[in-house]
Amino acid sequence: REERENPGAQLTSDCRGNLRIHAQEFKKKHGDQLGVGTEPEMMWLTKNEDGTPTGKGFSKPYCYHIDQFESLRPVFMKVFEYARAMGFDMIQGDHEDAPGQLELNWMYDDVLRNADRLSTYRQICAQVAREFNIIACFMTKPFMGVSASGCHTNMSLWTGGKDKINKLHHKSLPGMDEVFTYVEGGTNTFMPDTKDVQLPGKIGLKAIGGVMKHLGA
């Protein structure tokens, strides 16, 4: 920043910087680390010769239909190829309710690294769309009459655990160690701590209550 006073101050509109600071402060205060796994839905749409959207998806709107999923195999395999080269441990994928709507997931991790991967994933999809002459659409609802795209965000608080490099079968890493780093081990404090195996533990219940209280934010 170029201010005369405190030019090295945090930019308050920096979303990533805010997330990093809050996560570090929380861990320092409570000793827990926030783990996050996201489930990004998006649509692969067709376009006209002039590049404008046709308003149609590449596949038909059949949820969890293997044929619709396979029709996009060349596309999502290219996404996997690029993602793996950039440190993504891809773990699952499926076709959702809307036309051309896929959800491709990677391993959960530290909240900041997952946020970085989520942002990078959108860029990967955009590049793959260019190569296949289609549109990678992350709009929530690009047209009416179909299910919208969302992004489930699975949160948990962990104690312990260590950062470990996952080479993802690369003989030598094609990028920095940090890009291929994931938290391994530790204890999920949301797990049941009573005889009820379906009821989250005390910390989990408090976290759920806190999230519900502040949903409006």
Residue ranges and their predicted role:
Residues R1-A217:
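Glycine-rich, acidic/polar active-site loops that bind/position phosphate-bearing ligands
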